[in-house]
């Protein structure tokens, strides 16, 4: 995803794919709920250095993080509508300077506009996690195959550029070292 600190961040997501310890969903009351883009998500840092973990550790309170990289205000609102059915005391919206641009792009998506126009609209995403996981795995496989094809093409192109097969046929090799007397 990103390597801003000299490493790729890795975390075990919760049951819905968010950057939380899964047991946070089992708590009867949530003190802080975070929503936002990659800053809320904890992109580029490992636990316990992401904002939700820091807040959890400093406050000693429950923190649920619904942030995700690339989200803008309308997706964040939809996320709250889909996943917020808990007793939450405080919602912290992590807003960043690129959010107005994200909002302009999101306003073109009919599915997201439904959340604004219809207060009862829901895709019931919490109940469709198996389907969501399958779609994500399918997308990952497609992208991995594209990377393999791309790298395979680069390798073949490099072999051609070095004229490996012609060199083999003509027995053109680097000269052997001269043995010492």
Predicted feature residues:
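Interaction-surface signature
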Residues: 74-181
């Amino acid at each position: 995803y990103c390597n801003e600190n000299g490493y790729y961040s890795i975390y075990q997501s919760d049951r819905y794919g968010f950057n939380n310890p899964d047991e946070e969903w089992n708590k009867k009351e949530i003190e802080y709920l975070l929503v936002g883009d990659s800053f809320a998500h904890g992109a580029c840092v490992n636990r316990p250095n992401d904002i939700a973990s820091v807040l959890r550790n400093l406050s000693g309170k429950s923190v649920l993080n619904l942030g995700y990289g690339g989200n803008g205000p309308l997706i964040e609102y939809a996320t709250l509508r889909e996943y917020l059915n808990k007793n939450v005391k405080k919602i912290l919206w992590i807003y960043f300077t690129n959010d107005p641009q994200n909002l302009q792009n999101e306003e073109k998506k009919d599915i997201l506009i439904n959340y604004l126009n219809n207060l009862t609209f829901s895709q019931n995403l919490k109940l469709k996690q198996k389907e969501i996981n399958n779609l994500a795995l399918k997308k990952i496989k497609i992208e991995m195959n594209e990377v393999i094809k791309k790298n395979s093409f680069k390798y073949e192109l490099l072999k051609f550029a070095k004229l490996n097969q012609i060199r083999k046929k003509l027995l053109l090799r680097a000269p052997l070292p001269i043995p010492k007397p």
